[in-house]
Amino acid sequence: WIALAPFCGLLDWRPHIWVTGEHGAGKSDTVLEAIRVGMGSGHFISAKGSTTEAGLRQRLKCNAIPAVIDESEPNTNKDRLRLDGLLTLARNASSDDEAIAIKGTVSGEASSFRIRTMCCFASINPYIKELADQSRIAVLEIEKKPQTTATKDDFQTIKRNFLALDKLNFGTLFTNLMISRLPTLEANLLVFIEAAGDVLG
């Protein structure tokens, strides 16, 4: 996802992910930090759980930018309604033939948005109830490990590695590498699609 998301505007199909795990499993400190380091700050929209579909849509406009939405918890009816809107946006963004959103305005003139984002949701409880969303969103569950000296040492090693990569401006370097290999990426995507079709039907 980190490799593909910066090029979401070039893709015919844009998958999304939902990072989940119980409290203290390390969603923010590991996976979301890996996204920040791997893509580089400023190369994606970073939003919190109070974000609405309208807010994200207006922030995206016609720009092909990935979005990370942390704390996407479906705790209340209001939360679930808000997530329904965000999931509709993500669903429509998955394929180019569904990517045009037309909204009415108070002035009486329609406003058009071409939604070409790839979303990463993160929460303790994933909220994927529609079959259409299940085929578009991969759920990545983080297993919480017991607090031992070994696991604490591992976590500190991960943090040091992230810091070292960040100092090297790894996100920009990685994106530049992917740009230089776009023909290979496009060829590999076709292979992956064919292989996935054989497995998933």
Predicted regions and their residues:
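Phosphate-sensing "switch" segment of ASCE/P-loop ATPases
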Residues: 111-115, 130-201
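Short, polar loop motifs at secondary-structure junctions
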Residues: 123-128
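Conserved RecA-like P-loop NTPase ATPase core
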Residues: 2, 34-35, 70, 120, ...
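P-loop NTPase catalytic core of nucleic-acid-dependent motor ATPases
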Residues: 1-57, 61
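AAA+/SF3 P-loop NTPase mechanochemical coupling elements
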Residues: 60, 103-121
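Conserved nucleotide-sensing/catalytic segment adjacent to the nucleotide-binding pocket
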Residues: 55-106
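Residue-level preference for the first positions of well-ordered beta-strands
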Residues: 14-18, 66, 118
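Alpha-helical scaffold elements adjacent to nucleotide-binding pockets in ATP/GTP-utilizing enzyme cores
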Residues: 30-34, 85-93, 116, 132-136
